[in-house]
Amino acid sequence: MRKLLNEELGRPTLDEYAESKKLPVVAVLDNVRSAQNIGSFFRTADAFGIEHIALCGISSTPPNREIHKTALGAELSVAWSYYPTTLECIEKLRSEGYQIIAIEQIEGSTMLDKFVADKNQKYALIFGNEVDGVDQAVADIVDGAIEIPQVGIKHSLNVSVSAGVVMWEMFRQLI
């Protein structure tokens, strides 16, 4: 088998991508501290057509060298905004009709393999801090939670890995 060359991949231009239909999904970063993790969010959101990234609290924002290092330019193709707090972001997204879903190990969470996305619903997926996860004040006001099934002793994934798993599943179900 031969690997495809970049020019054979049929990649859209930045303008074509900007005009393309996106999934009705916003990735909300609740105080994600690593700029490299944030860059990975941008790259993954670009790959799966996520409409927006909301950077909250201590989360770094573009332009940032560390974000660019992992985003590889996807910070230019994915729309983003900054909010001083995740609670402010949630309030705005809820007022716009988004269902607020924490990606977290929470009582009553739905395992990702059991989650069924509604194609008529808009989703705001809350991804938490690398150490503390989704803040409890945020968890207290979400509409639901999705948990990624795991079998190892850590029961913990890097936040950008979690984003890849969940964004892929949303893409698979909503495309």
Regions found by a protein language model. Give the residues of each.
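Post-transcriptional modification and biogenesis factors for structured RNAs
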Residues: 1-175
